[in-house]
Amino acid sequence: MRNRVLAFLAAAAGVLIPFVPLSAHHGSAAFESGKSVVMKGAVTRWFWANPHCFLSYDVKDESGNITHWVAETSNPPDMINRGWSKGTFKPGDEVTVTVEPVKNGRPAGRLLQVVLPNGKTLHSASPFQGPSN
């Protein structure tokens, strides 16, 4: 009986251990969950690739200083299901971006939604949020 229990535990550990790095990769500890920041900016780059897409954009403050922001979102197949595409943005597009900022204060965050120049709003479901409605 004891050998069966040990064999079961060893098999269970062998199956579960490879998933530990995945949960670390898809953790949300770096983000200020529940806090959102809305800003207007100009797109500098739309990086459309696995495992995550990234939107880079410049935000100008009241004094004219520019801060370069980067927002992470989900993978292309998830984004396609939400109406996004590789051609959603082009450099220079003026957009309104909503992110959950990172905790360390850097100009980065998890992309929640974007209002496009034509007024259309696109919602993002990052790997941490699950599907949007």
Regions flagged by a language model, labelled:
Residues A7-P21:
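Bacterial N-terminal signal peptides
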Residues S23-V37:
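Short boundary/loop segments of OB/S1/cold-shock single-stranded nucleic-acid-binding domains
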Residues K35-P51:
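Structural detector for short beta-strands of small beta-barrel domains
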Residues A49-V59:
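Short aromatic-glycine-enriched beta-strand elements
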Residues T73-N81:
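Short, structured beta-strand/loop micro-motifs enriched in basic residues and often containing a Trp
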Residues N81-T96:
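Short nucleic-acid-contacting surface segments enriched for D/E, G, S/T with interspersed K/R
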Residues V102-A125:
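OB-fold/S1-family single-stranded nucleic acid-binding modules
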